[in-house]
Amino acid sequence: MTLQDYLRDPCGMLSIPYWKAQTVQMPPHIRIVHHRDYDAAAWADWNDEPYFRLMHDLCSIAPAEGPFVCRVAAEAELPLIRELINRSYTDLAVSMKQLQGYRTTPAFAADLWLIALDAQSGEPVGCGIADIDPVAGEGALEWIQVLPEHRRRGAGRFIVNSLLNRMAGRAAFATVSGQVNNITNPEGLYRRCGFTGSDVWHILKKR
């Protein structure tokens, strides 16, 4: 696939950002199929996890508001980023090696690694990681986490809008992906922040 093909319909052409598709080697036990081509009967022997993929044109971005502040995470704060991510999930975990690897990619942007804090207490409430592909002009939200005890206060929207505002003028558009059936409803958060689209990709793993 050429870059020009991808840019005509980013979320409909690939399930991941363009730069990743150029470097990631798909394991043989995994298949990725767009919903338009998906036939449940044909994949009956595979476990299916659907993922939405949405896009933001970065033209109209709400200000980052709420009882929070954010700061750029320093290299020395990678253990804190790891803790915030892992405490936000019950079904996955990231390692220091993974986080360090993210910071060596061609899309790495140091100022898009944010830690969100309660404005009064200074306590970390979550974090956000995004990147920008300078070739495709694509910004991508990679990790958006809010600790369980701080949810339902607007921290997720604060983090997303903080990242989008930092991308404006540097990327032509932004994308994000997440589990369709996640009980925390990440899709709802992203749509409230201005993301649009209807693309769904099925991540299929051989049983």
Positions of predicted regions on the chain:
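Acyl-donor-binding surface of acyltransferase catalytic domains
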Residues: M1-G66, H202-K206
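Conserved active-site tyrosine of GNAT-family acetyltransferases
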Residues: A41-W43, P186, Y190-R191, F195
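A short beta-loop-alpha structural element at the N-terminal edge
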Residues: V69-I81
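Conserved hydrophobic beta-strand within the GNAT/NAT acetyltransferase core sheet
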Residues: L141, A174-G178
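Conserved acetyl-CoA-binding loop-helix of GNAT-fold acetyltransferases
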Residues: W143-P148, R152-A168, E187-R192
